[in-house]
Regions:
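A short beta-strand motif characteristic of beta-propeller blades
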Residues: 57-67, 101-107, 139-146, 178-181
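Acidic, small-residue rich beta-repeat scaffolds with periodic aromatic anchors
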Residues: 2, 154-182
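Short polybasic amphipathic segments
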Residues: 44-55, 133, 160
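Short loop/turn segments that connect beta-strands within the blades of beta-propeller domains
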Residues: 80-81, 88-90, 119-120, 128-130, ...
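Extracellular-facing segments of soluble proteins and assemblies that are Gly/Ser/Thr-biased and enriched
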Residues: 75-106
Length: 182
């Protein structure tokens, strides 16, 4: 599968073994980054191969060693910043495509589920198994909230409604993470 944004084409790949992933990344003449390579429980292997359209047939690769858990890594593209955020295992990593470097890394308290980008507020909500973390588009943490296993998220204006498995629902202000009375 290919994704095109700004001056880049991204090919998403899945590999059966770490050896295959490393070989694929070794073919990237513009360099590569391997995320979570030190994990002892890696089970699944993914890559995003980036080809800047202005540089001909040259490639930059980002590989992910995932623990499996039944959750595939997610990526969130921010064309204005030329950045890709990767969410996997218990981590979110932002990669700057201009300088091909890790821009930020955020450790999570529980398994990553998905991103909720809020462009108008310049905020990205990171939904995890039992937490929500709000960050800026540049990766600066704004707030965290955790209570129980999250079963549903709903956004209305500047309010984030959360349903939990065994706890009562909560409503948070998206901008500061404070509880809001409903």
């Amino acid at each position: 599968m290919f994704i095109t944004f700004t001056e880049n084409v991204i090919e998403l790949q899945e590999w059966s073994t770490k050896k295959e992933l490393i070989y694929s990344l070794s073919q990237c003449d513009l360099g590569s980054i391997l995320l979570n390579e030190e994990d002892d429980y890696e089970q699944k292997f993914y890559a995003a191969i980036v080809r800047p359209q202005t540089s001909g047939l040259h490639y930059f690769g980002i590989g992910i060693c995932s623990e499996g858990h039944g959750l595939k890594p997610n990526l969130l593209i921010n064309p204005e910043l030329d950045m890709i955020m990767f969410g996997y295992n218990k981590e979110v990593v932002g990669v700057n495509l201009k300088n091909r470097q890790i821009a930020f890394r955020i450790k999570l308290n529980s398994l990553f589920y998905y991103f909720l980008p809020l462009k108008n507020q310049g905020i990205v909500l990171i939904v995890q198994e039992v937490d929500i973390t709000a960050i800026t588009e540049l990766g600066k943490e704004i707030w965290r909230y955790g209570k129980d296993i999250i079963t549903q998220t709903t956004i209305e204006g500047e309010k984030l409604y959360l349903n939990f498995m065994d706890e009562s629902p909560a409503c948070l202000n998206i901008l500061n993470g404070e509880l809001v009375r409903v």
